[in-house]
Regions:
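Non-catalytic, surface beta->alpha helical segment in thiol-disulfide oxidoreductase systems
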Residues: 71-99
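A short, acidic/glycine-rich surface segment
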Residues: 2-3, 53-56
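Local sequence-structure signature of Cys/Sec-based thiol-disulfide redox active-site neighborhoods
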Residues: 2-39
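Structural micro-motif
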Residues: 60-69
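Thiol-based oxidoreductase modules, predominantly thioredoxin-like and allied folds used
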Residues: 42-54
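Generic recognition of short, well-ordered alpha-helical segments
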Residues: 27-31, 56, 81
């Protein structure tokens, strides 16, 4: 059937990236997430678009561009990763958990 989604790590946001070969937006998203992981609790899961689960996620979310990015299983973006929007969302999540 395919690889199941990872279970969230306590307090960490699970970020799933479905990437494609030679995708510069995909490489940029991975670099951005590595930087954000220094400030926020993240668990990053990389899936190739050709893997059964990657294909299913792209089909289910009708992603027109790569990378497809999900946060805790919910669609966040497709194509260029909106860095500031993601950082604001992660900051809000951390503040909410810490409150």
């Amino acid at each position: 059937m395919g690889t199941p989604a990872p279970a969230p790590t306590e307090g960490a946001t699970v970020v799933t990236i479905v990437h494609a070969p030679a995708c510069h937006f995909c490489a940029d998203a991975q670099r951005t997430l590595a930087e954000l992981a220094r400030d926020f609790p993240l668990r990053v899961e990389l899936l190739d678009w050709a893997e059964p689960r990657g294909e299913r996620l792209v089909r289910d979310h009708r992603a027109p561009m790569y990378p497809l990015v999900l946060l805790d299983g919910v669609l966040f973006s497709s194509g260029r990763l909106p860095r500031r929007k993601l950082a604001r969302l992660l900051a809000t999540r951390v503040a909410t958990v810490g409150a």
